[in-house]
C-alpha cells in the first residue's frame, strides 16, 4: 500500500508540474554556492573518449587504472552521473550547459563534411570562466564543428588550442580518413587533423602517439602558467576511441585477455591513466595541486564493437540504454572538505550541471546571458558524506534526448510520437521510446559472465523501468505501470514543444581536405 501511495505521488507531480521557459532559464541561479572569499581554484577537466562504465579499475579490477582509482578514492565518485550516447552532444552540453534539444544537435554527431557546429550564439564555459579571470586552454579532441573559424576553440573562449578538430584520427599519423556515409566518393578523403591554435601541425609530429603528445602539451601549459590568475585546462583525450592503437608495452600485461580488441583497449586505458598521473604530478611539481579541482568524465558509454564494455548495464555507445549514457565520473581535490573525500555520491547528476557548477559555484563567475538546463550543485556536492539527502538536491529529471529528425523535413513536429527515439528520467523512473541500438547485456571478455541477447518485437515502441529496483533495465514495466508511462510521455511532448528544430545539414564537398592543403579545415569564410 505504501509503495502505491508513493508512486501515486510521483505520477501526480509529473502530471501537475508545468514546464516554463522562465524556470528552465533560471536553473543555474536557483541553487547558489555559498560564501565569498578564498582563492579561486584551478580547474582541470579530463574528458575520456568512449570509456565504458566497466572500463575503470574501481568498477572492474581487470582494468589497470591506479592513478584514476587513487584520485577517485580521495574524492567524490559520481555513481548516478549521466552524459549523452555519442561524442558531439556530450561535448556540446558540457561547454554550454544546455540540452541538445535546445541546440539542434538531437540527431547525431557533427560529421566532418557537415556545415555545422555548436551554436556560436551560445556562451561557452570557457568564455564565462575567462570573464571570471581564468586563463583557458583546450588540449585534445574538439568535435564540435569546424566548417567556419568562428566554430573553433580559440574563437569560443579558449586562449589556446592544441589538438584535433574531427572525431577520430590515426593516433600516430594524425590523419583522419573518410568523409561522410551519405556523400558518394568521400570515403577515401584523407587529411591531417592536428592544430596548434589555427595552424596545421600534423606533419610535424609524425609517429608521436597522440595521448603522449597531448599529455606533454598539458604539462607545458601548467609549467608555463602565470599563477597570478587561475587556470582552466580542458584536456579531452582521443583515447579510447577507435582506431585501437597503443604502444605494445601498454597491453603486454593483458595477455590473459584472449579477445584482441579488448586486450589493446585495456592497454589504451592504462596509457590514459598514466597520462592523468603525469599531468597530476606536474600540477604538484608546479605548486598548483593544493588549489586545483580535478574532474574526470567520459563522453558516452563504451563502444561494444571496439573493445569497450559497460557491464552490467544494458547497451552501449549510440544507445539511450544505461550502458550508453551512465558515465564514469568523479571529482578530486585537496580543496574538498575532509568529510567529502572518499565518498560515493548517488544523487542525479548530468553533464549540463558542470557549466553552472564550475562557472558560478567554483569560479564565482556570472551566468548572465546564458540559457541553461544545468544546476549549480557545488555547495551541495561539497556536503557529500554529510547526509546530503535527495530532497535538497535540485535535479530530479533528465531529458536524455528527443530526436524527431526526418530527412524529408526540418520542421519541428507539433506533437510527440513514440516513433521518435527518446528517453526521459524522472526520479527513479526512466522511459524510452523507439530504441534501435543494441539492447543486450554484453559481458566483458576477461570474465566468466555470459552475454545476454534480448530479441524484442520490432513493433515495440515504449519501455519503462524503475532504476532504483532495476538499474540494469531487465524488467519492462511500461504496460504494468501505464499510468507512469503516460505521464512521462506527456512530459516528452511538453519538452518537444520547447525544442528547436534538428539541425543536421547535408554534407558539403567543399570539406574535402584535398582542397585545403591536405588538411581538415574550415571551408566557409
Describe every region a protein language model picked out.
Residues 2-463, 471-506, 513-525:
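Formylglycine-dependent sulfatase
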Amino acid at each position: 500500500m505504501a509503495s502505491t501511495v508513493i508512486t501515486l505521488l510521483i505520477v501526480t507531480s509529473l502530471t501537475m508540474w508545468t514546464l516554463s521557459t522562465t524556470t528552465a532559464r533560471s536553473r543555474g541561479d536557483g541553487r547558489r554556492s555559498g560564501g565569498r572569499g578564498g582563492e579561486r581554484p584551478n580547474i582541470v577537466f579530463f574528458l575520456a573518449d568512449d570509456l565504458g562504465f566497466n572500463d575503470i579499475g574501481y568498477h572492474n579490477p581487470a582494468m589497470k587504472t591506479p592513478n584514476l582509482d587513487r584520485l577517485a578514492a580521495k574524492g567524490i565518485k559520481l555513481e548516478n552521473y549521466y552524459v549523452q550516447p555519442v561524442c558531439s552532444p556530450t561535448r556540446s552540453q558540457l561547454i554550454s550547459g544546455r540540452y541538445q534539444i535546445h541546440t539542434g544537435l538531437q540527431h547525431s554527431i557533427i560529421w566532418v563534411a557537415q556545415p555545422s557546429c555548436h551554436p556560436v550564439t551560445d556562451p561557452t564555459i570557457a568564455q564565462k570562466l575567462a570573464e571570471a579571470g581564468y586563463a583557458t586552454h583546450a588540449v585534445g579532441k574538439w568535435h564540435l564543428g569546424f566548417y567556419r573559424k568562428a566554430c573553433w576553440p580559440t574563437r569560443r573562449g579558449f586562449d589556446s588550442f592544441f589538438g584535433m578538430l574531427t572525431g577520430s584520427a590515426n593516433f600516430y599519423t594524425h590523419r583522419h580518413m573518410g568523409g561522410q556515409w551519405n556523400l558518394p566518393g568521400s570515403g577515401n578523403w584523407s587529411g591531417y587533423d592536428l592544430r596548434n591554435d589555427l595552424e596545421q601541425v600534423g606533419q610535424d609530429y609524425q609517429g608521436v602517439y597522440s595521448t603522449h603528445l597531448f599529455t606533454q602539451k598539458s604539462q607545458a601549459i601548467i609549467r608555463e602558467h602565470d599563477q597570478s590568475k587561475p587556470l582552466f585546462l580542458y584536456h579531452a583525450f582521443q583515447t579510447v576511441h577507435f582506431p585501437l592503437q597503443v604502444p605494445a608495452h601498454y597491453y603486454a600485461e593483458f595477455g590473459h585477455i584472449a579477445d584482441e580488441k579488448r586486450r589493446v583497449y585495456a592497454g589504451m586505458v592504462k596509457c590514459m591513466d598514466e597520462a592523468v598521473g603525469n599531468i597530476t604530478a606536474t600540477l604538484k611539481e608546479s605548486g598548483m595541486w593544493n588549489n586545483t579541482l580535478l574532474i574526470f568524465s567520459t563522453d558516452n558509454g563504451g563502444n561494444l564493437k571496439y573493445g569497450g564494455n559497460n557491464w552490467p548495464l544494458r547497451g552501449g555507445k549510440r544507445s539511450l540504454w544505461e550502458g550508453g549514457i551512465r558515465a564514469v565520473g568523479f571529482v578530486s581535490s585537496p580543496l574538498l572538505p575532509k568529510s567529502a573525500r572518499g565518498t560515493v555520491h548517488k544523487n542525479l547528476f548530468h553533464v549540463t550541471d558542470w557549466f553552472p557548477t564550475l562557472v558560478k559555484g567554483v569560479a564565482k563567475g556570472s551566468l548572465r546571458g546564458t540559457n541553461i538546463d544545468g544546476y549549480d550543485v557545488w555547495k551541495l556536492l561539497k556536503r557529500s558524506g554529510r547526509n546530503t539527502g535527495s530532497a535538497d538536491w535540485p535535479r530530479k529529471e533528465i531529458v536524455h534526448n528527443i530526436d524527431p529528425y526526418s530527412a524529408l523535413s526540418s520542421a519541428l513536429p507539433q506533437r510527440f510520437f513514440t516513433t521518435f527515439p527518446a528517453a526521459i528520467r524522472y526520479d527513479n523512473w526512466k522511459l524510452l521510446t523507439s530504441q534501435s541500438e543494441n539492447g543486450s547485456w554484453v559481458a566483458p571478455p576477461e570474465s566468466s559472465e555470459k552475454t545476454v541477447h534480448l530479441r524484442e518485437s520490432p513493433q515495440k515502441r515504449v519501455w519503462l523501468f524503475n532504476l532504483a529496483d532495476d538499474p540494469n533495465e531487465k524488467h519492462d514495466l511500461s504496460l504494468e505501470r501505464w499510468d507512469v508511462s503516460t505521464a512521462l510521455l506527456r512530459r516528452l511532448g511538453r519538452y518537444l514543444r520547447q525544442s528547436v528544430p534538428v539541425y543536421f545539414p547535408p554534407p558539403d564537398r567543399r570539406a574535402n581536405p584535398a582542397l585545403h592543403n591536405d588538411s581538415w579545415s574550415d571551408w566557409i569564410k
